[in-house]
């Protein structure tokens, strides 16, 4: 549907008030507009009254029946905001709605994964049917077909809801109750119904707990989860969330947008203003979080004298269990363990209060302080995949699911997260070691960034400097917000953004001038273009050939004939090292749908790589080049003059093609462990390069020092941010952030200016290879949930083939010698 048409429907514009251009887009047909109004209203589950649809559809009951049918067919969440209509008018309770959905998908023999995430979570809550239960039901359904008396799917489904969690501040409303229903009620149930009929809706906590459950199970009442303008909520690690699929309907999209934007200090009204979303929709979404148990309402929600005695033994919505005093969680990133207050010992922990802490809400973990801006650590989905796949500790998965689905792990939940990371062992075997390394390095990074007084300037003698809180944010979730909204959310809550390094090429990095960003300044800095920019300004780099989409190779270019291993980067995907012997078919397949960068990596097996952390220390720069003092390399000295490495942090990967003098222990494990292989879509097995580089980072062996010369090493890539794949590299970067005072006000101001300069230079460099008519390729990346921008969206594809060889970047025509020198002057430009 046209966005202009949607806007005018949302604003209740009748046909005669529509602008001429909108009418023209509808073919000047009022009937077409009426069809769009009805479709939009049903898709967005709009109430009949006070909306434009009432002028289009005269029969209110029929409209709601169509809405319910559409929602059921598309497996949408039950429209709880229309409960008064659905339950009282149509006698369709949430239980009966989800039973019909389950019956439909079982009759069609669909998999459990066909249920969208939030719908599956609500089915689990009400029906008690999760993945395993669904598989059992399907097996029973199929086996019954073999016998004469086959059972229908409905016969196998539960007859009444499982016992749900009800919070005392929820509101109980009467549903559709007949005289026959009243006759079978107990005395207490009749009294409760009479009170609601006479006095109106009642707080659940003021009624007898078992009566509320009994009436709900029979469908005589429904439950409202009231959210006011000034309500604040907290989101603990998700329990009971089902990771199936993202559907993309209006409400699910809204739920994900609010997930990543919400925080404990911002009330619902303020959040609606920041997101520029209708307040009623935001309340509906927050109400749904609380209903599903994914969020907890903060503050005193019901006074103790209102609470019926029966509620004392009632179960509560899942809560984050805190087992440490937050005042004792001021952590030392150097020591890696909590810094206990003077005079305290391990036995000083208040063990008598642990049971109370188990049921405490998330807010009890936060260090009492006035609302303050925070540091945001930006990560991508590969990190959450590592935390999920590694089976690292029993309760770590719920945090990883929260990081992926909510897109955020707030400071209030980091105590629990750190305790789970503490349980991760430091050693593992094979592939699992990579997951363990990332988990342990992530823990060290959190300890370093969170409440680190070395990262924040003193506020004065009256204000104690304890550092800043830390939130973890998933880049893909932020990209689900439009750029203006994302900027408002970041500016409202954060003082500094820090990216992990490297971020996956499959996502578009977050660009931000304010708050300042220690990470890629613009998406182009995380693209293939930036590699070529580095090579052109330093005059050094591996032989590299960037082929435009649609190119075709008849043979491997001569510059790569001497190489045993090539580094292949398909546009919008992560790089992989592949053998040169069988690369041609793979390259031509990838070139049909993507631009591809080919680089020489190793002449005798894999090339050797070393990571050089920056900012550089002055003492190291004054020294002579050596394997252990790589920052004295002449290419890096040139790079320092062209790119600001003093007010940023990250690492530069140096590559040595001639690695005959050393054989890694990992080489004995075979090529499968280290080589990334492009799949049919041109992507590769993720992080194959990281594995190899990580092995190389620690590979300082006897004889390497003596045989390394400066000319053997060339810069391969530069990554801004904090590396997580190597704990030693991460430790060095953390030390230099402190020693170079990167988070000081002056340094951050310099970072702002230098990031803008770098952005302009890189954009100018990219533009020099465009014909001015090259559009951004919509198929250049992989789109994910919430219709996020595709990878490298807005980053132009190359219009010509480019070759970097012998210190110069040239246009490559496919013949030797190459023509047209392009970027030799780049190295002579002043900064």
Swiss-Prot record:
Q: Which family does it belong to?
A: Belongs to the FAM91 family.
Does the record's keyword annotation contain Transcription? no
Protein location: Golgi apparatus, trans-Golgi network; Cytoplasmic vesicle
> Which InterPro entries does the annotation name?
FAM91 (IPR039199), FAM91_C_dom (IPR028097), FAM91_N_dom (IPR028091)
The protein's predominant localisation is Golgi
* Annotated stretches, region: Disordered: 341-362, 690-709, 770-794
- GO CC, one annotated term: trans-Golgi network
Assembly with partners or alone = May be a component of the WDR1 complex. May interact with golgins.
- Lineage of the source organism? Eukaryota, Metazoa, Chordata, Craniata, Vertebrata
Supply one GO BP term. Answer: intracellular protein transport
Q: What keywords were assigned to this record?
A: Cytoplasmic vesicle, Golgi apparatus
What this protein is called in its record is Protein FAM91A1
* Top-level taxon of the source organism: Eukaryota
Task of the protein: As component of the WDR11 complex may act together with TBC1D23 to facilitate the golgin-mediated capture of vesicles generated using AP-1.
